[in-house]
Amino acid sequence: MAKVDQNEALFERAQKTIPGGVNSPVRAFRQVGGIPRFVAKAKGSYFWDANDQRYIDLIMSWGPMIVGHANPEVVAAVQKAAETSFSYGAPTEGEIELAERICALMPSVEQVRMVSSGTEATMSALRLARGYTGRDLIIKFEGCYHGHADSLLVKVGSGLLTFADSTQNAPSSGGVPQDLVKHTLVLPYNDVAAIEEVFQKQGDQIAAVIIEPIAGNMNLIQPSKAFLAAIRTLTAKHGAVLIYDEVMTGFRVALGGAQSLQGITPDLTCLGKVMGGGMPMAAFGGKKEIMSKLAPLGNVYQAGTLSGNPVAVAAGLKTLEIVSREGFYECLTGQTQKLMAGLKAAADNNTVPFTVDSVGGMFGFYFVDQVPTSYEAVTKTNIDAFKKFFHLMLDEGVYLAPSAYEAGFISIAHDNAVLEEIIAAAESSFKKL
């Protein structure tokens, strides 16, 4: 009697009660094809699926699990917090401690407000910027994903990149009114001339510029120094708010986030993922002058029943304590670079056009000769080669992001033995391409 594939059985079952069988589109394997892996448990750098098959995890919950799955210290902190209650709907000392820790690690953040998701963080930051400036227009960049708030679903990256309308201001999702996104201007990433032109024409109407300081939703794309400098100069000159969406990069690429590596001081910063240690937790913060416009002090309303959830706060505090230890990011960055060098060498050994890039514990690889620097360039990479490579690596027990438009992540638990296993799997996979 043939053994039942539990992943397939669970996927079939899930589709009866969950749209598409998943609670976030990229998990459905639509771009790569095949059956999604349903996770049963995870530890360190590994997870086991419903068939009890072990995989090396190279997405780490899309970034949050920087100290490894089920880290004993984080688990203990969560258990202790859960013993008192899962939620109060009232202030706690833990919220203050987490806010103090964030403000200490990110000097641009003078005050911070907790929320429950990255989408809430960016949505609230935009509302705050509009309330502070009294303006409506916002600028975002092609391929940057800032959550699924309506006004930001225009030319986004991630799973939507595969079917987004190419029209300048067309919504990337059904259900988003064209009338709403008319307030969103979309510009090419890394294009200095484009942003200079828009500010020259409409500078006094722009409330905010929101940017992924290292784009991670069109694979990994780094900004040029000139591009970032132009954005900071123009927003300051015209009184627009510069919002750094560090939901992905905050505490992932460096202890002070991407802004600490780039020497840029944003007006507002959005955080998530790592700051919650894998729990539903996010935040937005920045200049006290701007943050004071939030209710109950000001007239910009924002609220949430589960904001500052005590269990999530406990996970976040312990995670930030661990990543703050001496040598953490040097080790994480070194391991990521070692992995990238190994993947590149394996591709070169098999004459496969392939490039890599990384920052801290975040990486990207591309089936093309040069590292892309824009949304347009990413769309021209070899997607068919990626799909084949994804499944070959999956067969070797290595779980990559099931999309060519997503960055990858490692954790401090990815030691040399794990890296060697990944590189050996890549060598075998490249030979079969």
From Swiss-Prot:
<dbReference type="GO" id="GO:0005737">
    <property type="term" value="C:cytoplasm"/>
</dbReference>
<dbReference type="GO" id="GO:0008483">
    <property type="term" value="F:transaminase activity"/>
</dbReference>
<keyword id="KW-0663">Pyridoxal phosphate</keyword>
<dbReference type="GO" id="GO:0030170">
    <property type="term" value="F:pyridoxal phosphate binding"/>
</dbReference>
<dbReference type="InterPro" id="IPR015422">
    <property type="entry name" value="PyrdxlP-dep_Trfase_small"/>
</dbReference>
<dbReference type="GO" id="GO:0006782">
    <property type="term" value="P:protoporphyrinogen IX biosynthetic process"/>
</dbReference>
<dbReference type="Pfam" id="PF00202">
    <property type="entry name" value="Aminotran_3"/>
</dbReference>
<dbReference type="GO" id="GO:0042286">
    <property type="term" value="F:glutamate-1-semialdehyde 2,1-aminomutase activity"/>
</dbReference>
<dbReference type="InterPro" id="IPR049704">
    <property type="entry name" value="Aminotrans_3_PPA_site"/>
</dbReference>
<comment type="pathway">
    <text>Porphyrin-containing compound metabolism; protoporphyrin-IX biosynthesis; 5-aminolevulinate from L-glutamyl-tRNA(Glu): step 2/2.</text>
</comment>
<dbReference type="InterPro" id="IPR015424">
    <property type="entry name" value="PyrdxlP-dep_Trfase"/>
</dbReference>
<dbReference type="InterPro" id="IPR015421">
    <property type="entry name" value="PyrdxlP-dep_Trfase_major"/>
</dbReference>
<dbReference type="InterPro" id="IPR004639">
    <property type="entry name" value="4pyrrol_synth_GluAld_NH2Trfase"/>
</dbReference>
<keyword id="KW-0963">Cytoplasm</keyword>
<protein>
    <recommendedName>
        <fullName>Glutamate-1-semialdehyde 2,1-aminomutase</fullName>
        <ecNumber>5.4.3.8</ecNumber>
    </recommendedName>
</protein>
<keyword id="KW-0627">Porphyrin biosynthesis</keyword>
<dbReference type="InterPro" id="IPR005814">
    <property type="entry name" value="Aminotrans_3"/>
</dbReference>
<keyword id="KW-0413">Isomerase</keyword>
<comment type="similarity">
    <text>Belongs to the class-III pyridoxal-phosphate-dependent aminotransferase family. HemL subfamily.</text>
</comment>
<comment type="subunit">
    <text>Homodimer.</text>
</comment>
<feature type="modified residue" description="N6-(pyridoxal phosphate)lysine">
    <location>
        <position position="273"/>
    </location>
</feature>
